[in-house]
Amino acid sequence: MPEATEHPPIGEAQTEPAQSGCPMVIKPPVEGGSNRDWWPNAVNLKMLQKDPEVIDPIDEGYDYREAVQTLDVDQLARDFDELCTNSQDWWPADFGHYGPLFIRMSWHAAGTYRVQDGRGGAGKGMQRFAPLNSWPDNVSLDKARRLLWPLKKKYGKKLSWSDLIVYAGNRAMENMGFKTAGFAFGRPDYWEPEEDVYWGAEHEWLGSQDRYAGANGDRTKLENPLGASHMGLIYVNPEGPEGNPDPIAAAIDIRETFGRMAMNDVETAALIVGGHTFGKTHGATDIVNGPEPEAAPLEQMGLGWSNPGVGIDTVSSGLEVTWTHTPTKWDNSFLEILYGNEWELFKSPAGANQWRPKDNGWADSVPMAQGTGKTHPAMLTTDLSMRMDPIYGEITRRWLDHPEELAEEYAKAWFKLLHRDMGPVQRYLGPLVPTQTWLWQDIVPAGKPLSDADVATLKGAIADSGLTVQQLVSTAWKAASSFRISDMRGGANGGRIRLQPQLGWESNEPDELAQVISKLEEIQGSSGIDVSFADLVVLGGNVGIETAAKAAGFDIEVPFSSGRGDATQEQTDVEAFSYLEPKADGFRNYVGKGLNLPAEYQLIDQANLLNLSAPQMTVLIGGLRALGITHGDSKLGVLTDTPGQLTNDYFVNLTDMGVKWAPAPADDGTYVGTDRDTGEVKYTASRVDLLFGSNSQLRALAEVYAEDDSRDKFVKDFVAAWVNVMDADRYDIGKGA
C-alpha cells in the first residue's frame, strides 16, 4: 500500500486505485470498509461533518451546561468518598482505596492533550472510546471507569462522563489529604471517537520508529504534533527510551513530551513527584494479558486485558512499583525515599526494568497492595530522572526541604492538566471553580457592548478611513481564524492580533498588518466611543464585506455581536500563543515553509479546527477569493475580473469547461488556467483551488454556488459562515463554536 507520506497529485489520488505488492482486502462497510480502501490519498471530508445531534441519544433541547449546574456537588463528593473505600471482589482496591487508580485514570484522560494542535485532553470523554480505551498505557482503566458506573448511573444527565472521569482523580486526592486548586465542571460528552486526531503512523503498540524517522537519535525531533514517545503511551516509556533504563536519557523524553503538553520543568516535576506520591504500578507476575477492550470477546462486556490475576497478582504495565510507605496519603515521602537511597536496577516479576534501594534499604517499609505483608519501595527509571537530571534535580531537591512548595506547585500543575483543553474561564462551571486565574488561561477582560448608534458611527469612520476592502476583511480574518475548536484558544476576542507573537507572524504579513492596526487604533482613540480594538477589527471586516456586496448589487448588513475585550501583552503567553501560528492558510492561499502535507490536506485540517462544515468551508473560499483576500496580494486563485466584489465568479470560472488547467511551467505547485480555444492564460490557481473542481464532493458543492440562481444564496451563506468564524470564540455571550 502507498506510504502515509506519499501525496500524489489531486487527480491521481482520486482516480487511481491504491497500488501494492499484495492483494487489496476490501471489507464491507459494516466491517470498516470505505472508498478510502481504493483511494487512500483522497482528502477526508468526514472530518467536516458537523451534525452531532444525529448520534446524540439525549433529548432535543437538553443543555449539559445547564444540567450540570443543578448537580449536588457536596453529595457527589460524599458518594465518591464512600465508593473509594468500598472494595469490589471483581477488582479489589489496592491498599483498600481506589483513589490512586482514579488519579491515573484522570491523568491519562487529560494527559493526551498536546499544545501543537490543541487536540487530545479529557474534555470530550474520549477515554471511553477507541483507540484510547485500548492503549497499552491505559491497561485496567476500563475497570476504573466501570467502578464509577454507579455514580454515573445515579446522577445521569446532570454529570457527564467527561466531567466524572477527571473529577474522580481530583476528589480522590482531596480524599487522601491533598488540597487541590479547585475544579471546574462543564465538559459535555461526545458519543463517538474523534476521527481527526493523528496519534502516529506506527501500526504496532509501543512502536516509535515512524515518529522519530530521520531524527538520527535526537529525541527532541519527535514528529509534530505528537505528544508521546511511543504509540499507545501517554508520555514516555517508564523503563526509559526504547526500554533503556537510563534516567538522564529518559529526562530528555520527559522534557520533550511534557513540554508538548504545555508543561514547563517545574510543572513537569510537580506532576511526576505529586502523582507518584499515590498508589503503585502492577507487574506482579509474568502472566500475559488478554486482548484490549476493542478486541476482547463479547462476553467480557467492554472490559479488556483479561487474565487470572487480580488484586495482588494484577498485571498492567508489567512494572511492580510502590513508591512510598503511605500510598493513600499525601506527604513528602516520595522525595524522602528518592533522595534517601542509592538505587540499583532489577527486573520486575514481569521482566520490566525498575529500581530498588541498594543494600536492602528501606526493607519491609512499604505495604503490600493486598493483605498485611511488607516490601521495599521501588522507583521507575523516569522517577530517577527527577533526581539525576540537573534541572529537575535542582527543583526537586528544594522541594525535599520545602514540601509546602511542592504542594503548591502540584496543585497548580494538576489543575492546569485537567483544564488545559477547556478553553476560556467562561466555560468553567460549578462551586469549586477557583477565583485565581493563570496566564495559560488566555484571560480576556470583559468588553463593553455597543449601542446601535455607536456601531453605525464606527462603521462610518471605518468606511471613511481609506482602508481597502482587502485590508479590512483580511485583518478580521487573520484575527478570528486563529481560533481552534480543539482547545478553544485563539480568535478575535482579546484583540491579540495587535500583540506579540501574532503581530509578527509571517502569515499575518506584519508590515501590512501594522498599517491597518495603526489606522484602526486611530479610529478607536478619536471616536469618543468606548470600543475595544477587538470589536473594531471584526466590525472593520463586516464593513469590508458590506462594501463588496454593495458593489456586486447586494444591500446587506453583516450581523455583529459587540462586547469583545482587549487583552494586554502581560496577559499573553507568547510561547503558548506561538503554537497558534498557521503554517498554512488555504483560505488566503498561504503556504508556509516545512509543511509535511500538501496544501489541500492542510486546508481540511484548518477548516476542521475552525469548526466549519464542508459547505461553509467552500463558500468562504469562494467569497474570500472573489474579494481578493490572498497572502501577499497574490492573484493566485482570484478567479474573477472584478476582485473586491462579493460575487460567485470563483465558482463560475472554476467549473467552466472553457478553461483548461495544467501545472505551471515553474513546477512550483501552482496551476495555470488557459482558454481552451485560444490558449490565452486566464487565471492561476493553487492545489487548494483545484481541489474544489477535482474532488467529487467539493465539486458538487462548488456547482451549487456556480448556478445562475445561486447568487443570492452565495452571499447569504458566505455572510453566515463569516459570522460563525468571527464569533467562534464568543463563549462570553454563549455563541462560541
Curated annotation (Swiss-Prot):
Keyword list, A-Z: Heme, Hydrogen peroxide, Iron, Metal-binding, Oxidoreductase, Peroxidase
Residues at which heme binds: H276
Region (Disordered), start-end ranges: 1-33
PTM (free text): Formation of the three residue Trp-Tyr-Met cross-link is important for the catalase, but not the peroxidase activity of the enzyme.
Cross-link (Tryptophyl-tyrosyl-methioninium (Trp-Tyr) (with M-261)): W107-Y235
Cofactor: heme b
One GO cellular component term: cytosol
Free-text comment on the cofactor: Binds 1 heme b (iron(II)-protoporphyrin IX) group per dimer.
Catalytic activity: H2O2 + AH2 = A + 2 H2O; 2 H2O2 = O2 + 2 H2O
Description of what induces expression: By the polycyclic aromatic hydrocarbon pyrene.
GO BP annotations listed: cellular response to hydrogen peroxide; hydrogen peroxide catabolic process
Active site: H108 (proton acceptor)
InterPro entries cross-referenced by the UniProt entry: Catalase_peroxidase, Haem_peroxidase, Haem_peroxidase_sf, Peroxidases_AS, Peroxidases_heam-ligand_BS
GO molecular function: catalase activity; heme binding; metal ion binding
EC number: 1.11.1.21
Quaternary organization: Homodimer or homotetramer.
Function of the molecule: Bifunctional enzyme with both catalase and broad-spectrum peroxidase activity. May play a role in polycyclic aromatic hydrocarbon (PAH) metabolism.
Protein name from the UniProt record: Catalase-peroxidase
Organism: Mycolicibacterium vanbaalenii (Mycobacterium vanbaalenii)
Organismal lineage: Bacteria, Bacillati, Actinomycetota, Actinomycetes, Mycobacteriales
